[in-house]
Amino acid sequence: MIFLTRTVRVVVLALLAIPITAVFATPHAAADARKRSQAEAGALARKMLAQLKVSRPLSIRGYSRRHFQPRWEKYKGRCNTREVVLARDGRRVRKNAACHPVKGVWYSPYDGKKLKSERLVDVDHVVPLAYAWRSGASRWSPARRRAFANDLKRPELVTVSHSANIAKGAKGPQSWRPPRRAHWCRYAVSWITVKRHYRLFVTRNEKVALLNMLRKC
């Protein structure tokens, strides 16, 4: 398994944290910090992308979501991974006794929608499970596939609108990109970070699409 260097990890985490930290800065300072962080993350993502193996996609034969995720795994107490992500990504989230969110506000970075009902959001796998299967995950152990599907350390899980998640499906960046172009940099950085960590290969068209998205950094 390839682990991110400390520098790469810090820059990626800094990019992901921009919306939170920016509220404490002036508009101009926040914009400057965002541009610097995106530029650094984009440069490192290009280096990581250059290290990924380029290959043709494997067959989808044998794929089933159950090979990755029979169900969301329990994380802490009664909370499963999905519930942890919804609590992490939402604002003013209220949960019932079973840890299920019953109220909150979620922002979908893919399309810019502000959603006030848990029924309108999904937890998306940035690198879709079926896509990962064709990128090398078909050769993994069941335990490794479950770890991938429930990974809270890498930028693999994100709360998005149900409509955006359905539109994306199991497509790669060569076939689908977030409608909100301002998210292209972060999306590409997240995709590459996940693929590098799990040593998943990329296709030629996928690599070209990612490089185009990184121009937004």
Regions found by a protein language model. Give the residues of each.
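Generic detector of short, well-ordered, non-transmembrane alpha-helical segments enriched
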Residues: 26-27, 74-75, 157, 187
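Bulky hydrophobic/aromatic packing residues
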Residues: 15, 20, 71-72, 90, ...
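Secreted/periplasmic proteins that engage bacterial cell-wall peptidoglycan
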Residues: 54, 58-129
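Secretory targeting and sorting signals
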Residues: 1-31
